[in-house]
Amino acid sequence: MRSDVITKGSKSAPQRSLLSALGLTKEEMERPLVGIVSSQNDIVPGHMNLDKIVEAVKMGVSMAGGTPIVFPAIAVCDGIAMGHEGMKYSLVTRDLIADSTEAMAMAHAFDALVMVPNCDKNVPGLLMAAARVNIPTIFVSGGPMLAGKVDGCKTSLSSMFEAVGAYNAGKITAEKLDEYENNVCPTCGSCSGMYTANSMNCLTEVLGMGLQGNGTIPAVYSERIKLAKHAGMKIMELLEKNIRPRDIMTEDAFMNAMTMDMALGCSTNSMLHLPAIAHEVGFDLNVDIANEISSKTPNLCHLAPAGHTYIEDLNDAGGIYAVMNEINKLGLLKTNLITCTGKTVGENIEGCINKNPEVIRPVKNPYSQTGGIAVLKGNLAPDSCVVKRSAVVPKMLKHEGPAKVFDCEEDALEAINTGKIVAGDVVVIRYEGPKGGPGMREMLNPTSAIAGRGLGSSVALITDGRFSGASRGASIGHVSPEAAVGGNIALVEDGDMIQIDINANTINFLVSDEELARRKANWKPRKPKITTGYLARYAALVTSGNRGAILDIPKF
């Protein structure tokens, strides 16, 4: 075992003395050492319950003959970080989490790992670490929050942000805003729609790194505790069989994940995270393949913000395996791939029925014949940009309107809230990309303000930043190349007509090649906004959104 270097032989006596200082017995040192990566903290609602999940994992590991040892990972709440400087520190934690987990796992020679994440950057960061370290690993998330209720109807955090927009527009009272505030987030857990955290937890299950229910069993259900115990037991089986992350997360597994991404209507952030995880496995996952997969993958789920169903409803309808079984009626999945269950994808999903065709549409009656995400290209985004097609109203799938250009989120939000944005406009927010932000902030406040003012079906928003999974409407992000490196989004001017055709996968601003060349010749790079600390280092190394905003290591 890997841990033999710290537990066996006379040369390891110093290490054993330190393990003894932890209270470990000789018997415990003779067992496999299983690291449990706990992301518990008291500031993230999706992580406040993870101490209970971790305790259940420890019990499972012990029952199966291992020695569980807990160490921490950080986590940021994107909702709390939203709309201020703190959002610059969200995406960047993905790489901090991967780096620090790699360091802990390698320094202490663990034999296996159980990852206990839940929220947005925590899940992909730990998947990246799992791919790097490549020792037997399993994931068990903290689970989704239950939906809230306002006026007797289910609702969630996306409605809360939109309520702020409605309040600023004078459409609701302060009392109604307070009602939303006190009711949309009723429990612990990751926010209740198909937002980024739940998207990644569901895709972890699809990749084969989490057991059935990992993405959908609510945080407050006892079944979640049982799942954690099973994960603790299962890791010992994976260790015995020497099944490792790179055995599970193959290229075909990522194709399955992309297919299910389209079927579920996941967050556009998945188009950042899946390529980043694949990069750690050792291959390039080009986002261009999304359109090829989308063209043959029907969208079967309209979970919030695209619709009025929630992760708890998906769980009741049969969960991720039921959606996989439904989509595979078209033969779209690779079913011979090994997973953390020790079985193949096909064996896992066999017999998993769709219990509610209103939540999981049958393949013969999908929400749309194409998938939930589209990748667009054109002179505004020569490399690519992405949009959650399933959350766009039909009339906005094709739109042409004048640009209203802003160089930061705050200026755009002020313009929206003061009525300077009108029906037909295309809001452009730039210099918010991975380098330019730095940190590629989410534009949930502007999109929510647009929706809250009743403009969601008539105004588009384009950015080199990104979007929360809670954003809806014609919200087009990850524009690459970004403005900070001279991408064409930096050359757009107020009043330029912008043409968007999501069904045709195109996005252009209507200026001549000669005018574009003139503007490019006059463009000058801006000084970095931040020159010290982690963000400065991140900005120096980070790549474009179309590459997953991975860090580019200089070659020596």
From Swiss-Prot:
Pfam families: ILV_EDD_C, ILVD_EDD_N. It catalyses: (2R)-2,3-dihydroxy-3-methylbutanoate = 3-methyl-2-oxobutanoate + H2O; (2R,3R)-2,3-dihydroxy-3-methylpentanoate = (S)-3-methyl-2-oxopentanoate + H2O. SUPFAM superfamilies: IlvD/EDD N-terminal domain-like, LeuD/IlvD-like. One of its GO terms (cellular component) is cytosol. Pathway: Amino-acid biosynthesis; L-isoleucine biosynthesis; L-isoleucine from 2-oxobutanoate: step 3/4; Amino-acid biosynthesis; L-valine biosynthesis; L-valine from pyruvate: step 3/4. The active site is at 468 (proton acceptor). It is an enzyme of class 4 (lyase). Its EC number is 4.2.1.9. Functions in the biosynthesis of branched-chain amino acids. Catalyzes the dehydration of (2R,3R)-2,3-dihydroxy-3-methylpentanoate (2,3-dihydroxy-3-methylvalerate) into 2-oxo-3-methylpentanoate (2-oxo-3-methylvalerate) and of (2R)-2,3-dihydroxy-3-methylbutanoate (2,3-dihydroxyisovalerate) into 2-oxo-3-methylbutanoate (2-oxoisovalerate), the penultimate precursor to L-isoleucine and L-valine, respectively. Homodimer. This is Dihydroxy-acid dehydratase. It comes from Clostridium beijerinckii (strain ATCC 51743 / NCIMB 8052). The gene is ilvD.
